[in-house]
Amino acid sequence: MEMDYPLHPPGTLVDTIYDVIKKEIAASHLKPGEKLNSRVLAERYQVSETPIKQALNRLITEGLVESIPRKGMRVRMISWAEIDEILELRLMLDLFFVSDVIKNLRENPELAEQLDNTILCQTACLDLIEDADYYNRTYELDNRFHELYIASSGNSKALEVFHNLNSHVYSSFIYGRQPKEQTLEGIREHQNILGTLVNGDENKAKELITIHISNARNHIYAALKNNDQL
């Protein structure tokens, strides 16, 4: 496969290669367990091996690629047990900070506006983006909503924990890719959650957050099962 790249200012080539490999994994052009040879990839993308190696190391930190001693790198296999644990921690984190988020949204309406704008972008994304670009952009916006939610708690350490978890959540998202109908369902759930937070209904917000995480869990499990990845 030949890739055409525009001229890159210094410092951007690694980012470009990183994005390309990430999209290839999302589109299953690079499959779970597939060996990643830096020389082969350099020829494939018509670049030197240095940015390839740097991009792969970055993907290792995100949980998309793994390095096996004496065997090299490969697209990381992900287990259902790991995904389940991540989602359990996400639920605990989200529920714990509901009251803080409600308080801060009330005191800082611009936070609610940022969350709402993210939902609007998610909706627009459904009509504008296809294939791997669609999956990557959908992930980015979904992640942004949850990131803003945790940030709205005002707890910087909680945000650090979220970011640490999130490096692996991306893996579960792309390996459990979902059709647009399910993505739209998730967007509606975001809308409903935000509505209850703005209205200050703590109990209802907790109920909707629990449903949202549970639905995500079920969708990912079903997708992995259908793809024989369980």
What is the meaning of each model-derived region?
Residues 1-7, 203-230:
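C-terminal effector-binding regulatory domain of bacterial HTH transcription factors
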Residues 178-182:
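Solvent-exposed loop and edge beta-strand segments that line ligand/cofactor-binding
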Residues 109-175, 187-195, 204-214:
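Conserved amphipathic alpha-helical segments that form helical-bundle/coiled-coil interaction surfaces
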